[in-house]
């Protein structure tokens, strides 16, 4: 079984979460990201696709892109657009699309368990994209994206999650 661990998240300020929330970086190109983030200085795309704040002809893998991501992340934190939790947590995430709810958790997983096969890959990622995201993590000193990991149904996990959701208010409703 894979190991998960809590962490101190850097999360959107609850008063502007709708302005910060953005689609994953890999479902749009730079031009689309520029259009989506236009007029919204709070969009997380300024961090995840920071090339939108640079010359449109810049090489996506230029060091300036990673430096801009870090600069934007630091500015978001300074302005409290993003705030860091005081204690480590495992976060419950519920998403409703087309009337169907999906519930999961957000936690840290082991890179070693991913490499040794304990956690199985569910998709092929092009090497240049892996290098890009590795650099992004290194420059930002933060993992700004999530990786979907599924597990075989375990009633005990469902019970823990459901009990928590039944007895606590959500941080965000969007």
What are these regions (language model features)?
Residues 1-174:
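A cross-family signal for N-terminal binding/gating loops and helix N-caps
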């Amino acid at each position: 079984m894979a190991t998960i661990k809590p962490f101190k998240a850097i999360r959107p300020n609850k008063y502007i979460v709708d302005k910060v929330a953005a689609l994953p970086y890999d479902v749009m190109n730079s031009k689309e990201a520029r259009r989506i983030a236009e007029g919204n200085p709070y969009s997380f795309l300024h961090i995840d696709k920071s090339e939108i704040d640079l010359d449109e002809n810049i090489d996506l893998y230029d060091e300036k892109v990673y430096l801009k991501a870090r600069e934007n992340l630091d500015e978001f934190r300074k302005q409290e657009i993003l705030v860091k939790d005081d204690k480590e947590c495992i976060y419950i995430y519920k998403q409703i699309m087309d009337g169907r709810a999906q519930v999961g958790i957000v936690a840290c997983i082991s890179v070693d368990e991913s490499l040794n096969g304990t956690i199985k890959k569910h998709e092929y990622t092009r090497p240049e994209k892996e290098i890009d995201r590795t650099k992004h993590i290194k420059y930002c000193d933060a993992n700004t994206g999530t990786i979907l990991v599924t597990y075989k149904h375990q009633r005990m996990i469902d019970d823990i999650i459901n009990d928590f959701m039944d007895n606590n208010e959500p941080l965000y409703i969007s």
